[in-house]
Amino acid sequence: MANATSFIALAYLLASALMTTVVLGNRQCVQAMDCTNVCSHGGLCTKNGKCVCWSPNVVINSGPPCWSDEMCFSTCGGNGGYCNYDIGGCFCQ
């Protein structure tokens, strides 16, 4: 009987681990992470768990660094903005 209980417990643990892997499989990050493990220059984690990487061409005082408009929406304090791709920085509204 002990072997059957051990087998059931082991099967449950393996199933739980597999489910966790599937759930996290499409995610690169969790919010509040800086994505340094994914992006060479850091970046932001989006709501869907994907890293948006900072541009390597960031100019100091250009606003928050960006690679896409989505990054500026997240970093401009919720007021929106767009990415000035020429300087790699956000223009916040």
From Swiss-Prot:
Residues 1-25 form the signal peptide. This is Putative defensin-like protein 282. Disulfide bonds join C51-C83, C66-C90, C72-C92. Its main location: secreted. It comes from the Eukaryota. Keywords: Antimicrobial, Disulfide bond, Fungicide, Plant defense, Secreted, Signal. It comes from Arabidopsis thaliana. Belongs to the DEFL family. GO terms for biological process: defense response to fungus; killing of cells of another organism. Transmembrane segments: none annotated. GO terms for cellular component: extracellular region. It is found in: Secreted. The keyword Glycosyltransferase does not apply.
